[in-house]
Amino acid sequence: MNDIKRLAGYIGSYKKDMMLGALMVMIETAFELVIPIMIADLIDVGVANHDLAYIYSKGFQMGICALLALVTGLLYARFAARASYGWGAKIREAEYAKVMQYSFSNLDHFDTSSLITRMTTDVTVLQNLINSGFRPVTRGPSLLILGIGLSFWMNPKL
């Protein structure tokens, strides 16, 4: 647990990117949850009344929602990449500083290429974990909370 706390200490200057990334995932999730409601409305009102103008209007609104979901998804990717790779750069910098403190007798036990490979591979794995794992960790609770909220909004007697 102490190792996790120590690693988390390097995220300091990237907290803003992590928060903005989480916000973008929540907004994207909201747009994705609104589109099925719009489709139901399109069918219940537009198709049932044969109102072509209403169908085109709802279709356009759904297209805008889909584009906004795409944009927020791309912004999430940008923020998550900046946070994870910036964090990884700080970890590598700390690792290299620690290796520089080794005595010559300790350095003789390791090849230079072995040290570099170990440090870069481990940090790359952690970067990819943060970059790809942050989305589902944020998206799951967002879907749950927004889904429950929308279900109560659609049917308050529920």
Regions found by a protein language model. Name each.
Residues 122:
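Short phosphate-coordinating micro-motif centered on Lys-Gly-acidic
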Residues 37, 41, 78, 82, ...:
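Transmembrane alpha-helix boundary and packing residues in multipass membrane permease domains
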